[in-house]
């Protein structure tokens, strides 16, 4: 092999020689092949070449998918059975139709903790995401997907129909760590995954592996950190054929290390059934691994090598491998496409090996007989030893033909896709080659007995920005489309563009294997599927390279997008314009030019213009001051598309002269009309019948110019809350004790009685109050001043014991005596001690520790009529002296009246009006300030209240119809009261102060009425101090005839008669309740129904 070897010390001085030789090799005459064909070298295609299709024209039939939230469309998996394509992108999986319509989107991103860990290890934020790099179908409905996952590869099992995750697996050794790493993988139906990738974080440990898709499966790999096996390999692709799996890669050539670093393209092969070595020899390593160099070069005395493989595709039906190659980075850019028969690849693996015994030794050719392990046969220890020695084949794999199928200078080929199409007469392979500048070259390759013919059919501009990077390219036969995955979008481009050829000659001369002329419709079209139409569809008898020197009729490109353009001689006016060019294809060699316009203009700026003035209108009236008008419109032309509107007025007015004055018109009267009724007021009573009111105003309209007032009433009343009120009962206070037997002398034994009454009412009306039967209590009083309620004694005949000594000598003590089971107590030595404020523990307060308070009186009226004031209530100690009870006898409470500001500015309220027929009375006041401030004249001007319904009528009726009955009942009641008063007043009412204090009660009380566990009052009376609320009984004068039975008990309780006020309350009585005798607190009860009358 002839090689140009440059010694390192002379490299810079002889670099110019290398450049000259490279140019001579690329541009010199090409040798002929044995078949008589010559390989066409690439030509510089300009945009006026008939084979060039611009991005604008390409997108007219293409489909582009773009998602602003997604980038890096690196993987595609076609699922023909379900008419869908699975797309892997950054953090996302898509399920789409073949026309790139999204069917489902599944997010699959790395967790925040994984991203943080990735950045902590030194990686950039851009790459610390989950980039999908592996997509494989497994079984009938399973998808196996793997992603970089922020440099922590992860895999997942999903369903093909809805991308639902069914399982998760580690992606280490199955998926690369870095998104830009060159890797390849192949999944067999038995679940064995063959992978060529970097297996560590740094990307330095590159290997070819076999592992299972299930977890914890044993894997085989190339020997680690051994350059004879793999030396910095960059994987391009892989395919399976027969018992073998083949990997295409480029790596540093270990056999050329002594002369400097060189990149060679390789094909590596392993057996599918390789079980690996045993013991310490090739344990977990391949025993069938071999690799050979791929030769793609231009022949000559100094062959021009394209050493770096970039893309590959395998035609399984033809057993042909296609690959794209580039020159090394240190030489002039050049690219080529080479094809290899599988038989040529296997022949190289059947040849001798190239071995280097040690690092300083020269490489030599070696043959060995123990090769069964390389043919997927059985192996032994001896075979393992041979496998550990030999990996590199001595002979390179030679391409089909003596030179590349297609090559070009100053271009860089990348990925490769293949379609095999049957024309009307023969079979043609169509290659889609990605080139620099985001161009796609469509090449036709035809094999026959004489050799290979490769032709450039079309050149596509796949992107007009020049910023996107092609990540994946694949061809789908079902849709006859090429799919491009870039870092920005996903694009589907139809393989044929027949409609751009407008004549039969142009169609046939294009030599596009997808196109033919349909004479029925006279159009260039793809091959029809209907056999009856196929006979009218014509192609060239033989597909050759396009005829470039024949007349080519021009064809219009697609319209450009609408854009702003400027009108001629009007710098402030713009239009919307779009253009097309006659370059799809451009007419050449006398071909017909395009027919039609090349520019379209619309939506031009149009400034407004006035129309002519209209005729003057009639005067607005026939007398007085009037005007007439004329009009014009801005419609000649109307402003449009940003044009200026007309300047000036669209209406002109002029006074009408010489019109007679108009007579003065009398204003028309307007009768008043009622407005809507207002809301109903609150009811005047909660039960027993009340009234509520609503009002309306005569303001809809208000009477004007002498119009009539509104008929009817301004106010409206109705009854409310007609349900009956619940009857309320209350007890009156006990009357004072009245002497009923004896001579009236308090020093003699006598009997006393007292009474209380029950009042019932069903409404607040005083006339509804009814008085029930009285309740009475009796007690026996002795000559010593003590009294005792009547009770049966077991020892009635036993004499009372003497009084015990007084408990204290001063300050008030207690004496007790016992008779039978009863006992009595009285106060003694009540005169003050020398130091009364410091009573000892034997004082009256400690002796009478069970002194009880009476009930509180009613609250007094508030001390003020507006603002904040006080109200008071009092109570008396039932033991006879306030000092004998714990607590306060007076209690005060704050009370709040209406704010005093409400009276500012107002006059005094008027008297209440008479009751209306609706039972309502009113009063009013007026504001004394003409312009009141915010604090003056606040509140209502009128105030209303409800009267007792039909009070006057009932009173009149009672005074006439029932007068005899009232007189009779009054006389009968007076006679009864006189008889009772005669019996009660036989004894003197009042006692001296000392006797009152010494008067005690017995511990056991009895009543001459029925037994009752409640007693309204204690059985001891005190008269040392009169309360504020006096009993209605007064001390009888000696001249009083009360004891003679001349007293009168009436409703009004006239004091001059010295008769009790039945409903009056004493200071020891409760409003409505009783005191439980056995209760230590003497609680007041409100349920008077428990009093058994």
From Swiss-Prot:
In egg chambers, high levels of expression in the follicle cells, with little to no expression in the germ cells (at protein level). In stage 3 to 7 egg chambers, planar polarized at the basal epithelial surface (at protein level). Residues 50-495 form the Sema domain. It comes from the Eukaryota. Residues 1041-1053 have a biased composition (Low complexity). One of its GO terms (biological process) is olfactory behavior. Its main location: membrane. Glycans are attached at residues 48, 162, 182, 285, 295, 341, 603, 745, 998, 1046. Residues 1-34 form the signal peptide. Residues 553-605, 607-663, 671-726, 794-834, 850-901, 904-953 form the TSP type-1 domain. It is a single-pass membrane protein. GO terms for cellular component: apical plasma membrane; endosome; lateral plasma membrane; plasma membrane. GO terms for molecular function: chemorepellent activity; semaphorin receptor binding. Residues 1018-1056 are annotated as: Disordered. CDD domains: Sema_5C (cd11265). It is found in: Apical cell membrane; Lateral cell membrane; Endosome. InterPro entries: Plexin_repeat, PSI, Sema5C_Sema, Semap_dom, Semap_dom_sf, Semaphorin, TSP1_rpt, TSP1_rpt_sf. Disruption phenotype: Adults display a slight decrease in olfactory avoidance behavior towards the repellent odorant benzaldehyde. Also, the ellipsoid body in the brains of many mutants are decreased in size. No visible effects on development and mutants are viable. RNAi-mediated knockdown in the neurons of adult males significantly reduces survival to 37 percent. Adult survival begins to decrease from approximately day 9 post eclosion. Pan-neuronal or glutamatergic neuron-specific RNAi-mediated knockdown decreases adult climbing behavior. PROSITE patterns: SEMA, TSP1. It holds the Pfam family TSP1_2. The chain crosses the membrane at residues 960-980. Keywords: Cell membrane, Differentiation, Disulfide bond, Endosome, Glycoprotein, Membrane, Neurogenesis, Repeat, Signal, Transmembrane, Transmembrane helix. Disulfide bonds join 118-128, 146-155, 271-376, 296-338, 619-656, 623-662, 634-646, 683-720, 687-725, 698-710, 862-895, 866-900, 877-885. The keyword Transmembrane applies. Belongs to the semaphorin family. Regulates the motility of migrating epithelial cells by providing guidance cues within the migratory environment and may also play a role in development of the olfactory system. May act as a positive axonal guidance cue. Function in neurons is essential for adult survival and is important for climbing behavior. Promotes collective migration of follicular epithelial cells in egg chambers, likely by acting at the leading edge of the basal epithelium cells to provide guidance cues across the cell boundary to the trailing edge of the cell ahead. This is Semaphorin 5c. It comes from Drosophila melanogaster. The gene is Sema5c.
């Amino acid at each position: 092999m002839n090689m140009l070897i440059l010694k390192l010390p002379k490299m810079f001085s002889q670099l110019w020689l290398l450049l000259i030789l490279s140019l001579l090799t690329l541009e010199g005459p090409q040798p002929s092949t044995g078949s008589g064909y010559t390989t066409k070298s690439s030509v510089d295609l300009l945009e006026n070449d008939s084979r060039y299709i611009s991005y604008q024209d390409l997108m007219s039939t293409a489909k582009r998918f773009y998602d602003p939230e997604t980038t890096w469309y690196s993987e595609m998996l076609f699922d023909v059975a379900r008419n869908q394509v699975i797309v892997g992108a950054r953090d996302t999986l898509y399920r789409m139709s073949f026309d790139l319509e999204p069917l489902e989107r599944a997010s699959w991103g790395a967790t925040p903790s994984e991203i943080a860990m990735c950045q902590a290890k030194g990686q950039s934020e851009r790459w610390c995401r989950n980039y999908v790099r592996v997509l494989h179908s497994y079984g009938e409905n399973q998808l196996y997907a793997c992603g970089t996952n922020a440099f922590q590869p992860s895999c997942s099992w999903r369903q093909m129909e809805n991308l639902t995750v069914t399982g998760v697996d580690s992606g280490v050794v199955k998926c690369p760590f870095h998104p830009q790493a060159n890797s390849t993988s192949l999944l067999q139906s038995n679940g064995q995954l063959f992978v060529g990738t970097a297996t560590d974080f740094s990307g330095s440990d590159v290997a070819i592996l076999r592992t299972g898709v299930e977890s914890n499966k044993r894997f085989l790999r190339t020997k680690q950190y051994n350059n004879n096996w793999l030396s910095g390999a960059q994987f391009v692709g892989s395919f399976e054929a027969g018992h073998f799996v083949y990997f295409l890669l480029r790596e540093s050539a270990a056999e050329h290390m002594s002369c400097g670093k060189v990149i060679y393209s390789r094909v590596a092969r392993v057996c599918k059934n390789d079980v690996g070595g045993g013991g310490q020899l090739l344990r977990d390593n391949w025993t069938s691994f071999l690799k050979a160099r791929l030769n793609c070069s231009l022949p000559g005395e100094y062959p021009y090598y394209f050493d770096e493989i970039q893309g590959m595709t395998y035609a399984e039906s033809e057993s042909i491998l296609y690959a794209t190659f580039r020159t090394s980075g240190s030489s002039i850019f050049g690219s080529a496409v080479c094809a290899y028969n599988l038989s040529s690849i296997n022949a190289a693996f059947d040849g001798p090996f190239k071995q280097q015994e040690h690092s300083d030794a020269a490489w030599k050719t070696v043959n060995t007989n123990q090769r069964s392990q390389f043919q997927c046969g059985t192996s032994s220890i001896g075979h393992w030893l041979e496998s550990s020695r030999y990996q590199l084949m001595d002979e390179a794999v030679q391409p089909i033909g003596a030179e590349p199928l297609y090559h070009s200078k100053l271009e860089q080929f990348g990925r490769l896709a293949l379609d095999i199409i049957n024309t009307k007469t023969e079979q043609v392979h169509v290659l889609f080659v990605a080139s620099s500048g985001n161009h796609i070259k469509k090449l036709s390759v035809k094999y026959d007995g004489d050799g290979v013919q490769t032709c450039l059919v079309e050149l596509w501009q796949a992107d007009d920005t020049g910023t996107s990077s092609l990540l994946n390219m694949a061809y789908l036969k079902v849709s006859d489309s090429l799919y491009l995955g870039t870092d920005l979008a996903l694009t589907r481009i139809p393989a044929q563009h027949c409609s751009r050829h407008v004549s039969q000659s142009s169609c046939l001369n294009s030599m596009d294997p997808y196109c033919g002329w349909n004479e029925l419709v006279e159009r260039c079209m793809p091959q029809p599927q209907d056999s009856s139409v196929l006979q009218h569809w014509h192609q060239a008898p033989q597909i050759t390279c396009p005829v470039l020197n024949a007349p080519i009729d021009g064809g219009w490109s697609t319209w450009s997008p609408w854009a702003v353009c400027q009108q001629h001689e009007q710098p402030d006016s713009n239009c919307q314009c779009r253009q097309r060019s006659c370059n799809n294809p451009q007419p050449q060699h006398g071909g017909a030019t395009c027919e039609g316009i090349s520019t379209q203009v619309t939506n031009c700026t149009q400034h407004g213009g006035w129309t002519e003035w209209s005729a003057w209108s009639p005067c607005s009236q026939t007398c007085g001051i009037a005007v007439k008008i004329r009009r014009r419109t801005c419609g000649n032309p109307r402003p449009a598309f940003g044009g200026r509107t007309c300047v000036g007025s669209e209406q002109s007015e002029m006074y009408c002269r010489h019109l007679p004055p108009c007579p003065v018109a009398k204003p028309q009267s307007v009768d008043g009309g009622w407005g809507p009724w207002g809301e109903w007021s609150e009811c005047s009573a909660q039960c027993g019948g009340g009234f509520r009111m609503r009002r309306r105003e005569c303001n809809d309209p208000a009477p004007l110019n002498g119009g009539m007032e509104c008929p009817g009433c301004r106010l409206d009343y109705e009854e409310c809350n007609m349900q009956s009120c619940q009857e309320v009962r209350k007890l009156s206070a006990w009357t004072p004790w009245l002497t009923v037997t004896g001579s009236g002398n308090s020093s003699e034994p006598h009997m006393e009685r007292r009474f209380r009454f029950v009042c019932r009412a069903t409404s607040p009306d005083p006339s509804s109050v009814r008085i029930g039967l009285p309740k009475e209590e009796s007690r026996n009083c002795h000559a010593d001043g003590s009294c005792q309620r009547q009770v049966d004694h077991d020892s009635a005949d036993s004499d009372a014991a003497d009084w015990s000594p007084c408990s204290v000598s001063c300050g008030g003590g207690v004496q007790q005596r016992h008779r039978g089971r009863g006992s009595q107590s009285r106060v003694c030595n009540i005169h003050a001690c020398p130091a009364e404020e410091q009573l000892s523990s034997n004082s009256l307060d400690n002796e009478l520790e069970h002194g009880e308070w009476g009930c509180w009186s009613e609250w007094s009226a508030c001390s003020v009529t507006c603002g904040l004031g006080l109200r008071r209530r009092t109570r008396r100690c039932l033991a006879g002296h306030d000092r004998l009870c714990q607590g306060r006898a007076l209690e005060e409470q704050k009370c709040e009246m209406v704010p005093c500001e409400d009276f500012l500015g107002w006059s005094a309220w008027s008297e209440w009006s008479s009751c209306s027929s609706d039972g309502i009375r009113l009063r009013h006041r007026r504001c004394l300030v003409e312009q009141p401030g915010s604090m003056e004249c606040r509140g209502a001007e009128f105030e209303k209240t409800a009267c007792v319904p039909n009070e006057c009528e009932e009173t009149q009726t009672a005074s006439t119809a029932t007068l005899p009955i009232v007189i009779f009942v009054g006389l009968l009641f007076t006679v009864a009261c006189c008889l009772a008063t005669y019996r009660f007043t036989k004894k003197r009412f009042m006692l001296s102060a000392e006797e009152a204090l010494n008067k005690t009660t017995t511990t056991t009380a009895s009543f001459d009425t029925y037994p009752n566990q409640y007693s309204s009052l204690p059985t001891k009376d005190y008269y040392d101090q009169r309360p504020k609320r006096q009993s209605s009984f007064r001390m009888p004068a000696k001249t009083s005839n009360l004891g003679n039975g001349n007293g009168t008990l009436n409703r009004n309780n006239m004091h001059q008669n010295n008769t009790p006020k039945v409903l009056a309350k004493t200071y020891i009585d409760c409003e409505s309740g009783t005191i439980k005798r056995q209760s230590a607190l003497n609680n007041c009860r409100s349920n008077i129904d428990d009093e058994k009358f």
